[in-house]
Amino acid sequence: MSQTLSDKIKIVVSSGKRKTSIARAVIKPGIGRVWINNVPVEFIQFELAKMKILEPLLLIGDLAKTVDIRVNVHGGGYMSQAEAVRIAIARGLVEFFNSDEVKSLFKEYDRHMLSGDPRQTEPKKWGRYSARRRWQKSYR
């Protein structure tokens, strides 16, 4: 889903999902800046989440300094949001650079970076507290 505004400017819009988090990334030519919900990625407090978000950019190396990325993400917790952002960025970079080399690099590193993680929470069953836990049984 790429849109070419002119011969010089190329903008790619991509999305990623993880559990209940949904991220939409807009990638365009720039100097390597990354914003998550209009906040620079450097200000994200959770170090593990920040590392997850920056994984695709670290993998492609110097190519990351040629694009600016803006991501809007909502839903879920901070870690599933980080995973959704990572998926959206990776998909967008593959589409932006239109390179099989970048795609194979991401797939070799982690196949869920492009395809997403299919795991979901198991639904709650009737007659139970949650999906697996049952009511406490008393014998006396």
Curated annotation (Swiss-Prot):
Gene Ontology annotations of biological process type: maturation of SSU-rRNA from tricistronic rRNA transcript (SSU-rRNA, 5.8S rRNA, LSU-rRNA); translation
Cysteines joined through disulfide linkages: none
Alphabetized InterPro entries for the sequence: Ribosomal_Su5_D2-typ_SF, Ribosomal_uS9, Ribosomal_uS9_archaeal, Ribosomal_uS9_CS, Ribsml_uS5_D2-typ_fold_subgr
Lineage top rank: taxon: Archaea
GO annotation, cellular component aspect: cytosolic small ribosomal subunit
Molecular function (Gene Ontology), one example: structural constituent of ribosome
Keywords, sorted A to Z: Ribonucleoprotein, Ribosomal protein
UniProt-listed HAMAP family: Ribosomal_uS9_A
Family recorded in the similarity comment: Belongs to the universal ribosomal protein uS9 family.
The name this protein goes by in its record: Small ribosomal subunit protein uS9
Species of the source: Desulfurococcus amylolyticus (strain DSM 18924 / JCM 16383 / VKM B-2413 / 1221n) (Desulfurococcus kamchatkensis)
Gene assigned in the entry: rps9
